[in-house]
């Protein structure tokens, strides 16, 4: 059992939880995720690690309420417990494998949409601790859907806000802001984009045109976090990959985003899942040969 040390409501449908998880807190790195199950009857939920405290043995996750399980999780409070908190899983951020010398040569910009801010924060924090400066562009529909603004300002060199309605920051999309910054003279060698699939697609279309290498984190398409359900299957270049096993980070210019979006639409229905299973045969799963997580 894992104790909830802190609960904070960030928006109407997004909340933050700090969980006492000594083993995960000791081993995790920026970019990794955990699988959470709140009780015996609960489904497995993959959640990206937003922050961790090795001294106090806690791990912070940010959760968007999009289904019955996340709604139920959102009703828990400090002092209550979660049944399973498994991790760290997935490959750490590419940044954690680079030397200080390599990082110093890069001008890095993060582009985050919605809850994509959560996995961006620990990467910015990692760079900050190494003395590396990086910018971040954050997008949301309106200001009441923006999260972790104050936290980002502590770890990023520049925080650029965009909202669809112009209620805060620049009116428009994150791609508009990125292109504007480049046109104004900003130079970036590396872009790390995390957010809705459609957002990452258009960021990658822009950065390919601008000649900026781009990494995307495919956390949003994961369902059970083990490769068993096949939901996070995607094509990268000409190879089949699974976000939860092989990622979640991939070369954004190699990802077939249209295929990902079509797959997500099909995966929402039982008929669609059956169709995908038949079409993809043995490549439907991440090597398990089962179809767990589809019930």
Stretches with model-predicted labels:
Residues 71-223:
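FNR/FR-type flavoprotein reductase catalytic core
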Residues 154, 242-246, 250-295:
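Short Fe-S-cluster ligation motifs
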